[in-house]
Amino acid sequence: MVTVEEVRKAQRAEGPATVLAIGTATPPNCLDQSTYPDYYFRITNSEHKTELKEKFQRMCDKSMIKKRYMYLTEEILKEHPNMCAYMAPSLDARQDMVVVEIPKLGKEAAVKAIKEWGQPKSKITHLVFCTTSGVDMPGADYQLTKLLGLRPSVKRLMMYQQGCFAGGTVLRLAKDLAENNRGARVLVVCSEITAVTFRGPSDTHLDSLVGQALFGDGAAAIIVGADPLPEVEKPLFEVVSTAQTILPDSDGAIDGHLREVGVTFHLLKDVPGLISKNIEKSLVEAFQPLGISDWNSLFWIAHPGGPAILDQVEEKLALKPEKLGATRHVLSEYGNMSSACVLFILDEMRRKSAEKGLKTTGEGLDWGVLFGFGPGLTVETVVLHSLTT
């Protein structure tokens, strides 16, 4: 008779979870940030609000974003005028779009990741799907399973409505799944579409306008597994440790609420200040066991909530400007895509590292940190170890 201990030992992987492939996707509709205020105030019938438009123009100019991709086109918005108002009942129309489009965009990213991984999709044992919008039953995880033709026995986990820290959360979950199920191959998909948060401007709610200036659409997928098959799988990063914490005195700093009008977005406190004040504590807790205290010796992947967060983190930790280079690049090319952002940055970093002929996937460095920041204020900290390019 086999003991529980023996079963448990056989279930566990030998080595740490590794990222084996990354894929990304965006909707085809690309919007230039410099002309976005003209488009936005026209499509929302708000051109008479000239002062507000000037404020929005300044927000967009300061955003450090060049362009964003959005599923919502002018044609779609003309068909749904309630989505262009600030507070008009429109949840049904929004839901009808996102329950279809979120799994579809997720599939595009997943197909690219599976292709890079190079293994048959029948070897995927687990699926983690993450999105901030489109709660439905059965969920986007089920829809993606059908779209990709995954096995019906794939073990699914659906994460709805987490927000911008969740790119770190999915790595934490995928690590635990991969390391505790020998041979597991976890497909992780973050798919974000702003059709639930898009709304017209309001003079009295400038925090909502901040969201309109920053958010973009995108999906990212990764394959995570421990004990990569030699000569068959090519690991990119090892996921060494993970942590999650709620920052002190940050209640209500970032909120999102599902209403008849869609998801409303609220910024109540000094978010960049709260993050920069507390970030070193998370770094010390994560890297002290490794004997690392020089934050410039790490490669950096930080959720780009907005330029002020990056500027204040950089200043607080005395980071060299190039440390947040990959993060700022993704912000400028795509905007804030919520949970998908950090996976886009991970992809950008390994690609640039290979193009430049650097010795590791982490800009030539061995150790790195991935941060997710979002509602709560919740911070996810992931310690990564790079591998040879």
From Swiss-Prot:
Pathway: Secondary metabolite biosynthesis; flavonoid biosynthesis. This is Chalcone synthase. The active site is at C164. SUPFAM superfamilies: Thiolase-like. It catalyses: (E)-4-coumaroyl-CoA + 3 malonyl-CoA + 3 H(+) = 2',4,4',6'-tetrahydroxychalcone + 3 CO2 + 4 CoA. Coiled coil: none annotated. Keywords: Acyltransferase, Flavonoid biosynthesis, Transferase. It comes from Casuarina glauca (Swamp oak). GO terms for biological process: flavonoid biosynthetic process; polyketide biosynthetic process. One of its GO terms (molecular function) is naringenin-chalcone synthase activity. Belongs to the thiolase-like superfamily. Chalcone/stilbene synthases family.
